[in-house]
Amino acid sequence: MAKTIGIDLGTTNSCVAVMEGGEAKVITNPEGGRTTPSIVAINEDGERLVGQVAKRQAITNPENTVFGVKRLIGRKFDSAEVQHDIKVLPYKIEKAGNGDLRINLRDKQYSPAEISSFILADIKHTAEEYLGEKVTDAVITVPAYFSDSQRQATKDAGKIAGLNVLRIINEPTAASLAYGLDKKKDEKIAVFDLGGGTFDISVLEIGDGVFEVKSTNGDTHLGGEDFDLRVVDYLASEFKKDQGIDLRQDKMALQRLKEAAEKAKMELSSSPQTDINLPFITADANGPKHLNIKLSRAKLEELVEDLLDKMAKPCETALKDSGFSASQIDEVILVGGMTRMPAVQDRVKKIFGKAPNKSVNPDEVVAIGAAIQAGVLQGDVNDVLLLDVTPLSLGIETLGGVMTKLIEKNTTIPTKKSQVFSTAADNQPAVSIHVLQGEREMAANNKTLGRFDLADIPAAPRGVPQIEVTFDIDANGIVAVSAKDLGTGKEQSIKITASSGLSKEEIDKLVKDAEAHAEEDKNKRELVEAQNTADALIYQTEKSIKELGEDKLDNATKAEIQAKIEELKKAKETTDTDQIKKLSDELTQASHKLAEAMYQKASQEGQQASGGDAGASADGGTSSAAGGDDDVIDADYEEAGK
């Protein structure tokens, strides 16, 4: 049975794990890393780069290198979050025809779901290389506070990457699985998850294989990227004060600042102070300029104080919604790389009144939890019951622009809820169902998930027709809504499926493109391997001829081998993989004669050496005997005679 992998698709880094021998194991990438940077780039040759290779070239190619795409997925171009990001991101974000956003890389537009699919395809390939078999099924994690459109867009990304996404699971819930799988006693835990781009807090009751989420809250636009930007702004401001040059206007310099800011932030988790040195950061008429700034932990904490303050309210709301007080929480589990920051840990301690639990690896625990959930779905992990919740309330717009909630936030999923509504005017022939997600009282202040019409309602006074609206949330947290005229039985439904901004046709086309790209990558890899093999074979053969001595090979054999070498050298410069392999095989066959000649030469030399040594000793013995040096003669003579 093919394995199902667990993927933590992160803002900054992604991680993949799989169940092996009853335990979840993180799969290392080809560079040996246990996490892969969530970065995609298109280089000047039009080649797509993913992960570490994309990160390495980001400084020289900032406009065509995408990072932090998770903060954009499932969002509209005009949303406040996207408008904020446009001001600080080096790559171009444009408005799509349907109001969604597109990322422009080398004059080609990509949706955030498509960019995410490139990361997922790379992770899928890593897993396949490790497992030695094709991987199609996966469990992918998302922030608990992701909206329906963000979840659907993530699922679409998986589909484009060639994955069958069995389940979308919330990151804190996945982390709780990894933490609590072997715990026998009942515990109330809070999972505090601060990652590269998102913040989640979930309160759960766990024990004896049951993981019940009581409440969840968060901010899908708060994370390490925001902390980095504060440091970047500080460095740019200090440099401008000192040199009069604004580095924010130089995208290459800005990318160097970003990398330096991220590194400094990490160093300050273990050191009270760090030096930021960026030689040749820019230049003016007087020559090159260098940046050298000291940054203390205290200064960093001052720069990000308001971001740290933002973490308190979601925690307080989650506690209130769960029905528990902070003192009733047994453990606070830290998840996400940003929780290594001492100031974050101090805030957690202040909010919950206890030191946080650091027993799990914050970078890997979510992927491990996803792999455990994959094991549950596959039947490899038994006696685990996961009861997750919907993070936001769901409802429809009713008379006066009010949002009427059908499903309250923190309702256990999957769930289904119906309510009967009626018409607002006499003889109303149709009703428009405006599906909403959010906590505000007025429809305009909540997020629109979709709209659909139920038509052909028989003429009747207002308030008479009975329209039953049903909300259905599946285990992935994805919503389907239907409206039924109870009088006629006529029904209309909507599954919120185009939330990634991509139609079914567009997704199918992208799936085909991804498959073609995978085939192209495979062919490219085979060509490079064939060229490398040919290179090594040519080198080895030419070296062997030189070692043997050209006079030791008969002319016909030498000419045949030389001709094969020349043919292979020419083929090696082409892109014909089959021809390179064929000529490599032919040169290998021709080289067998060379190997025979070398073996014969080695045998002859061995025999000559053996015979020659014996003769020399005997001769030496005789002449020395004449010289009367008996002791030496006897010893040498006996040794040679043996």
From Swiss-Prot:
Top-level taxon: Bacteria
Sorted UniProt keywords: ATP-binding, Chaperone, Nucleotide-binding, Phosphoprotein, Stress response
PROSITE patterns named in the record: HSP70_1, HSP70_2, HSP70_3
This protein's record includes keyword ATP-binding: yes
A GO molecular-function annotation: unfolded protein binding
Comp. bias regions, Acidic residues: 628-642
CDD domains: ASKHA_NBD_HSP70_DnaK-like (cd10234)
Modification Phosphothreonine occurs at: T198
Keyword ATP-binding: yes
Compositionally biased spans, kind Low complexity: 602-627
Segments of this protein annotated with the region Disordered: 594-642
Inducers of expression: By stress conditions e.g. heat shock.
Functional note: Acts as a chaperone.
Family: Belongs to the heat shock protein 70 family.
Protein name as catalogued: Chaperone protein DnaK
Organism lineage string: Bacteria, Pseudomonadati, Thermodesulfobacteriota, Desulfobacteria, Desulfobacterales
